[in-house]
């Protein structure tokens, strides 16, 4: 029933998008202008609210959005004017899609591996696999939001518009991915590193970011968040691990190019030999890439999953498809620091 209702809304979205009046509309000023126009057109956000896209979203407004997406009565919130955090927005939308159980599977798998995930881990994993979050255009990092910050109407509109595009196959894919998210037994040091990594799920992608706050140890940044190499630095170089020895010294360069080039070719870890907490490097030519061609990186969780900071922010993803094709090589800082034994 939910899929038929979403299909009806999607048909309405397409009709409005292709109409002459909409085609002649003046370009908006919000990064999510198209999505704001969509949710107003289908009646799940008031035009007056959409006109102030950077205003914090209220519980009452979120209730209206969810009711519109699910074709149910608007729930009477006891605090309709209260603000909604980004984490709460994602959790509510994941629930509206009927994917709460899938979110629980992600969380339980991380708990079983001993990684002590935060309560938002599962819903943030699902929200990002669905594409409900996105990186803002260059120059707008100041608009990025951390999980505990109030969500804006623009963020809610983007997510709702994305949901209108989803079909039954999309939700089925999430259910299948959640069922496949089973992590291996890890060593004490792998557990330490991965526990740090999963703590940051849901933080936004911020260019040149390497801290969860503006006050980075390496200088101020526009907003708390990470780019792909900055996320790895935060986990491996900034975090203070008891008895970590030389671990922070293993990574010298800050970029993907530098970190991938610091490991000699003979010590690069191939795809089939990856272990939890290994660094992953990606390049356009896959294993034939040169360090200068490595343009993305992440941290391996195990059993075909990794965590990284991408256009969806800090998220987990399966190491398959596009990522498997572009996988260049891995690196094992824990071995370099003498904290794990050779395989």
Language-model features: where?
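Glycine-rich, acidic and aromatic/proline-enriched surface loops and short helix-turn segments
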Residues: 38, 68, 95, 99, ...
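Extracellular/periplasmic catalytic domains that process cell-envelope and extracellular macromolecules
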Residues: 39, 119, 125-128, 187-192, ...
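Non-catalytic ligand/cofactor/substrate-binding and regulatory segments of enzyme domains
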Residues: 23, 165-205, 326-343
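Bacterial N-terminal signal peptides that target proteins for export
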Residues: 1-10
């Amino acid at each position: 029933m939910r899929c038929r209702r979403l299909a009806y809304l999607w048909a309405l979205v397409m009709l409005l998008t292709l109409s002459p009046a909409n085609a002649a509309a003046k370009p908006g000023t919000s990064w999510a202008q198209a999505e704001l126009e969509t949710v107003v057109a289908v009646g799940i956000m008031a035009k007056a609210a959409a006109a102030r896209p950077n205003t914090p979203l209220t519980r009452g407004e979120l209730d209206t959005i969810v009711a519109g997406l699910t074709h149910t009565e608007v729930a009477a919130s006891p605090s309709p004017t209260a603000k909604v955090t980004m984490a709460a927005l994602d959790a509510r939308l994941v629930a509206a899609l009927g994917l709460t159980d899938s979110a629980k599977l992600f969380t339980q798998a991380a708990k079983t591996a001993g990684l002590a995930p935060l309560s938002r881990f599962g819903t943030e994993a699902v929200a990002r696999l669905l594409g409900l979050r996105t990186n803002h255009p260059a120059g707008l990092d100041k608009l990025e939001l951390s999980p505990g910050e109030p969500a804006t109407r623009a963020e809610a509109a983007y997510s709702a518009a994305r949901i209108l595009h989803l079909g039954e196959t999309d939700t089925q894919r999430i259910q299948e991915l959640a069922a496949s998210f089973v992590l291996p037994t890890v060593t004490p040091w792998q557990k330490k590193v991965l526990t740090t990594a999963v703590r940051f799920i849901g933080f936004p992608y911020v260019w040149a970011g390497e801290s969860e706050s503006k006050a980075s140890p390496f200088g101020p940044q526009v907003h708390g968040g990470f780019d792909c190499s900055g996320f790895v630095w935060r986990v491996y170089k900034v975090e203070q691990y008891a008895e970590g020895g030389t671990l922070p010294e293993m990574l010298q360069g800050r970029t993907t190019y530098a970190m991938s080039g610091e490991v000699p070719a003979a010590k690069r870890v191939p795809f089939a030999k990856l272990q939890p907490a290994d660094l992953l490097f990606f390049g356009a030519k896959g294993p034939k890439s040169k360090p200068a061609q490595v343009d993305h990186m992440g941290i391996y969780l195990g059993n075909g999953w990794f965590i990284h900071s991408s256009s969806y922010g800090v998220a987990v993803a399966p190491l398959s498809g596009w990522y498997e094709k572009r996988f260049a090589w891995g690196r094992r800082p824990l071995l370099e620091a003498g904290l794990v034994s050779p395989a």
